[in-house]
Amino acid sequence: MELGLANKTALVTGGSKGIGLETARALAREGVKVLVCARRESALADAARDIMRTTQAKIEVHPLDVTKVEQIETIPRIITDKLGRIDILVNNAGTGTYKPFLEVTDEELVEGMAINFFAQFRICQRIVPMMIAQGGGRIVNVSGQTGIMTLNPPFLSSCTGPAKSAEIRFSKVLANELAPHNIRVNCVIPGFINTPERFAKWERELAKRQLSPEDAARERSLWSSNQGVRDTRWGTPEEIANLIVFAVSDAASYINGAELVADNAMDKS
């Protein structure tokens, strides 16, 4: 299958680890010149070395906090300086808050929207004019399964779910609006992906809730025994990266405005 990605350029947010890192690696293998953005410079440096080691491709990096509007404003200049043009945008940065509805703080609610939906909206708004000016482009917004289904404890998502749903709806609206400009927009919705960062995040959430040692141990047993996932297995970042690469390739030229769910049939609806 010819993907037609050689010599294209791409920006991947949240690209220093997990799905973002593997997406940057997979794009680099296809001959794409990749710019990876994430918050921590040390993590970006590690990602660049890792991708160079496995692909012999040099990637560009730039620190970026997608919750800071003033930093998002600099993206067009960064792209021009480091890539020259922008063919592909992968909006991967995001996170989740998993706690009971009545325990979610207003700060967590605002942060959840800012790092997920607001960031994707704002970044697209800065990059789309560049794509229109150059004649087209491809965008993938990465959402999550809490945007399409309600999960079992401990994966409580009253805060994260609405933000992820907004990303999905935004992708569909944008696909329709930008189709006349030769810009395709799709939304990739991963299921449970097994990364060290996911479990570290849940540990931080547990610490915030100040559970008893017994209750904390009970919640950890749900993670490790897969009871929260029921009859399906955990996916890998590489599997989601492969889907993203396909979605931005010439092989997916008729796929636009799609919800691309990769969850091993976890969602039975």
Residue ranges and their predicted role:
Residues V140-A166, S171-P180, F192-I193:
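Catalytic loop of short-chain dehydrogenase/reductase
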Residues L3-L35:
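Canonical Rossmann dinucleotide-binding motif of NAD(H)/NADP(H)-dependent dehydrogenases/reductases
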